[in-house]
Amino acid sequence: MKIQKIGIITSGGDCGGLNAVVKGTSQMATQKKIQTYAIPNGYAGLYNLLDTESLVELTPKRIDTFSIGLAGSEAGHSRVKISKIKNPKKYERIKDGLKKFGIDALVISGGDDTGSVVEDLDSHGIQCVHAPKTMDLDLMPYSVGGDSTINRIAFFVSELKTTGRTHNRVMIIEVFGRYAGHTAFRGGVAGEADCILIPEIPVDWDEVYRHLKKVYIKRICESDIRAGTYTIVVAEGLKNSSGEPIYDESAGVDTFGHKKLAGAGKYVAQEITKKLSADEDIKLFMEQTGMYVEDLYTIPEVRTITPSHLVRAGTTLAYDANFGMTAGANAVNLLLKGLSGVTVCGNSGKTVYYMETHEAIKQRHVDLDEVTLFEQLGFCFGRVRSSYEPECKKTSGPIERIY
């Protein structure tokens, strides 16, 4: 079947790089004499196409009105999973909606849940290609949004040290990432956090406190004005002592059926506060540094900050802009090769790499050997530091790099 019209869908959470996917898709399609249309409101918009009066065509003039340097999506989002819709004829309804507008294929950008819907649509005869998007970075290939989010986390961690140092506070920053710790890990390192707690590592609270006490006290005692702070970056999917994720039970579930992760930062603050309160050395330290006031100021302040949606908003960083453009463009190329139900993984020159979407959306966790390297550099990851004895290999020619 010759493709004449492509619909573009962005789904799930917003982040940096999505406008680059939209633009890359549209610009490549234009080069191939194919029209592109934005299907608004994610999968909700796809389901409701039959009742939609018109779609916005992404002409060269229209796509010139928005920037790939801005996060978010010109196409709009919703968190709707098609398989959760009760209508038994939902896929027939979607096909009728696509037929109404003459749309032959779809480019769909999103994370694991979005990818699972790509599989469903493909299995029902709807040609579609998945452009990976999630700031959580928990897919097998790189996904749009990751680098932009990591940079924003690093910025917030670094900036919060000024208020932390002014008040000699322990600062806890809780960040997104669901059940993978990539953004907390990389953002925490780049922001020079003292401690980084991720779902992949069960927390040893004694080890966290040992590191905090040593670093915090040393930092303040060595300051000529007795000023210092200690920063902890916490992934939202952190597990409690029984190995269960920490949920905000009052928040319910989202439309994909996931419990809303929340409260990890508060949980860490409670654990730290308990240990500070029970430690006689802390009272002595507070007295020696002129901070102690009976009944009023007996332990260092512990504050929790949740930047929340600020880490997915604002500006798209250069890598996400580049990757998003190529992911969108190559999604078109894959469609033109007759492929469907696959995920764009990247390209090298004129070679486009892809994998089956069911493989691409398998959860990818932090490589703990990478964590071990950073433990040698002084970062605490909530466990006893592991040894790091790398194997060294000689190489030649081009090696993998981001640019």
Regions found by a protein language model. Name each.
Residues 36, 105-110, 116-120, 127-128, ...:
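Accessory alpha-helical/coil subdomains and C-terminal extensions
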Residues 2-51:
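N-terminal phosphate-binding or glycine-rich loops at protein starts, especially the Walker A/P-loop
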Residues 11-14, 39-45, 79-80, 111-114, ...:
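Short, ordered loop/turn segments at secondary-structure junctions
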Residues 5-13, 73-78, 104-108, 170-174, ...:
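Short glycine-rich or small-residue beta-strand-to-loop segments that form or flank ligand, phosphate
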Residues 248-403:
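C-terminal non-catalytic interaction/assembly regions of soluble proteins
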Residues 49-106, 113, 144-158:
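Glycine-rich oxoanion-binding loops at beta->alpha junctions
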Residues 15-25, 46-47, 88-92, 106-119, ...:
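Short glycine/serine/threonine-rich phosphate/pyrophosphate-binding segments
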